[in-house]
From Swiss-Prot:
Enzyme class at the top of the EC tree: hydrolase
Cofactor: Zn(2+); Fe(3+)
Residues binding Zn(2+), per UniProt: 74, 76, 244, 319
Record's protein name: Imidazolonepropionase
Residues that hold 4-imidazolone-5-propanoate according to the record: 83, 146, 179, 247, 324
Keywords of the record: Cytoplasm, Histidine metabolism, Hydrolase, Iron, Metal-binding, Zinc
This enzyme's EC code(s): 3.5.2.7
Catalytic reaction equation(s): 4-imidazolone-5-propanoate + H2O = N-formimidoyl-L-glutamate
Pathway recorded for this protein: Amino-acid degradation; L-histidine degradation into L-glutamate; N-formimidoyl-L-glutamate from L-histidine: step 3/3
Length: 407
């Protein structure tokens, strides 16, 4: 009989989808095991016959499925306002250029966010965060990017820090100051990039407000030369980088980000084979964002087969934002990744667990059920992991465990 220490907690009578690639079964499935949690981490996974059947800290899950906590590795969670009216305009035939000329588009969100009080932004973001937590998310990336000026970018990152301080969910904050050119720099995007590189990145990094730097390398964002200035600045300070790349056109952004050993290249609908090879060589994760693909009614799909052939890890994320992916649901993103992009359900699960952890640099502690990893996991009223992907309108979450505590 296995000896338990005071304070140990056990989940028994479970079906474990460990998402551990070292296990041969699909999803890393293993039956008739028990999970021992000690001080917020998984202490061990052992045959349940080695443990007592009952006790003060022994939870009998009656055969339910247990998976790692979900990880949403790409969100724009902190913003004010919404863009529902301009979505209706687009459906009625208005062009993006027409909407932008009326003050719509990303600058509408920037204006609303700049004007919004920090406490209000926090309350808005907290409600969104708890929606994701209710789906089993235990680690969440939050980008800035709706300030496009030092004061508001800092405000957004402070909100992310306040959310993290609640200890309800892990937050990985990302500085996305190079998201778009603000209206006041419309005729001087290079000048804005200078502000980002010489002021925003160093000052906000010194304050410890973010973990990584992101950028939007695209025909409607920043060109390759401007994007490289951002990457050079970040890497000179030892800051991990990532990028929104190849969403609407092929500019070579994935190759650029991979050359700087980027954590991830996100969107990647127009990614080519050279970009895929560069991602493999740079250790860069491909992050698929099917919500934006759906909402923008795009037709160019990411090269999933090439990513498989080159063995590039593929993550899946919600991309929750008010303009192009207003879907605060990782379950829905998993389903869309399968239906629209051709991922298998097992690939979708890897995309919101171990590959999403790698996209955030957390692969040594998150995204799998293994001894030594964080005790972040979800108990589901389900028999198979595919059920969560198959029916995104139903949430079979039974219990969410964060840092070893039922939450």
């Amino acid at each position: 009989m296995r000896q338990l220490l005071p304070g140990d907690t056990v989940w028994r009578n479970i079906r474990l989808a460990t998402m551990d690639p070292q296990r041969q079964a699909p999803y890393g499935l293993v039956d008739n095991q028990a999970l021992i949690v000690r001080e917020g981490h998984i202490c061990d996974i052992v045959p349940e016959t080695q443990l007592p059947v009952s006790g003060d800290n022994i939870h009998d899950m009656q055969g339910r499925l247990v998976t790692p906590g979900l990880i949403d590795c790409h969100t724009h969670l902190v913003f004010a306002g919404n863009r529902a009216a301009e979505w209706e305009q687009r459906l009625n035939g208005a062009s993006y250029q027409h909407i932008s000329a009326q003050g719509g588009g990303i600058n509408a969100t920037v204006s609303a966010t700049r004007a919004c009080a920090e406490e209000t932004l926090y309350l808005l973001a907290r409600e969104r965060m708890m929606r994701l937590a209710s789906e089993g998310v235990t680690l969440l990336e939050i980008k800035s990017g709706y300030g496009l000026e030092l004061a508001t970018e800092e405000k957004l990152l402070r909100v992310a820090a306040k959310l993290a301080s609640e200890n309800a969910i892990d937050i990985s904050p990302t500085l996305l100051a190079a998201h778009a050119t603000p209206a006041e720099y419309r005729d001087d995007p290079d000048g804005y990039i200078t502000l980002v590189c010489e002021t925003m990145i160093p000052q906000l990094w010194q304050k410890g407000l973010f973990d990584a730097v992101d950028l939007f390398c695209e025909s409607v964002g920043f060109n390759v030369a401007q994007s490289e200035r951002v990457l050079q600045t970040a890497k000179a300070l030892g800051i991990p980088v990532k990028g929104h790349v190849e969403q609407l056109s092929l500019l070579g952004g994935a190759q650029l980000v991979s050359r700087y050993q980027g954590l991830s290249a996100d969107h990647i609908e127009y990614l080519d084979e050279a970009g895929v090879a560069a991602m493999r060589d740079g250790g860069t994760v491909g992050v698929l964002l099917p919500g934006a693909f759906y909402f923008l009614r795009e037709t160019q799909r990411p090269p999933v087969e090439l990513l498989r052939r080159y063995q590039v890890p593929v993550a899946v994320a919600s991309d929750f934002n008010p303009g192009t992916s207003p879907f605060c649901s990782l379950h829905l993103a998993m389903n869309m990744a399968c239906v629209q992009f051709g991922l298998t359900p097992e690939e979708a699960w890897a995309g919101v667990t171990r590959h999403a952890a790698r996209a955030l640099g957390r692969q040594a502690t998150h995204g799998q059920l293994r001894a030594g990893y964080r005790a972040d996991f979800v108990v589901w009223d389900a028999e198979q992991p595919v059920e969560i992907v198959y029916e995104p309108g139903r949430n079979p979450l039974y219990q969410r465990v964060y840092r070893g505590q039922i939450s």
